[in-house]
Amino acid sequence: MAADSQTSRLLTFTLLCLLWPQEAGAFPAMPLSSLFANAVLRAQHLHQLAADTYKEFERAYIPEGQRYSIQNAQTAFCFSETIPAPTGKEEAQQRSDMELLRFSLLLIQSWLGPVQFLSRIFTNSLMFGTSDRVYEKLKDLEEGIQALMQELEDGSPRVGQILKQTYDKFDTNMRSDDALLKNYGLLSCFKKDLHKAETYLRVMKCRRFVESSCAF
């Protein structure tokens, strides 16, 4: 009887060891199509948020008569222009998925520091509640892109060291004209960079999973 009891305990222990996941990868993985769909939705949301934030700032602080001249003067240089990233859909279609993912990751990571100061320039605005969560949304997208990179890892050369700079933080001294112009330029770059990231992700999703929404 004792032998039977010991055998039963050993069998139970063995079954538990077999069923317990040995590593994170033992859990069911999300389908690649779902990973792409989630990343695209996050990028679209962030791009729209960046565009809305830019418009709100412009409406609140930049006189209408000065907007065109300021935009043409390129008051802020976007660091993303220093990397050999595609500038549009057509160029993006000529790059591999891994290249586009790495460029997307670089763009997102370059804003993780600066956006932590974004909510401070909208303390008296309806945009405050939204802008205060931008950092968390960027982190979510960063994790989504990294998950895609792990799925598609192909051993190709990395481009992660190309963009070492990050953007300056947003200036909270809203009584200074220089600060206003700086923030206006940063928001313009933020909008452009998120548009690029969204474009790259949509190009990848469309060429892997042909669908009617590929025309954009």
Swiss-Prot record:
It is found in: Secreted. PROSITE patterns: SOMATOTROPIN_1 (PS00266), SOMATOTROPIN_2 (PS00338). GO terms for cellular component: extracellular space. Its main location: secreted. Plays an important role in growth control. Its major role in stimulating body growth is to stimulate the liver and other tissues to secrete IGF1. It stimulates both the differentiation and proliferation of myoblasts. It also stimulates amino acid uptake and protein synthesis in muscle and other tissues. The gene is GH1. One of its GO terms (biological process) is positive regulation of growth. Residues 1-26 form the signal peptide. Disulfide bonds join 78-189, 206-214. Keywords: Disulfide bond, Hormone, Metal-binding, Phosphoprotein, Secreted, Signal, Zinc. This is Somatotropin. Zn(2+) binds at residues 45, 198. It comes from the Eukaryota. InterPro entries: 4_helix_cytokine-like_core (IPR009079), Somatotropin (IPR034975), Somatotropin/Prolactin (IPR001400), Somatotropin_CS (IPR018116). The modification Phosphoserine is found at residue 131.
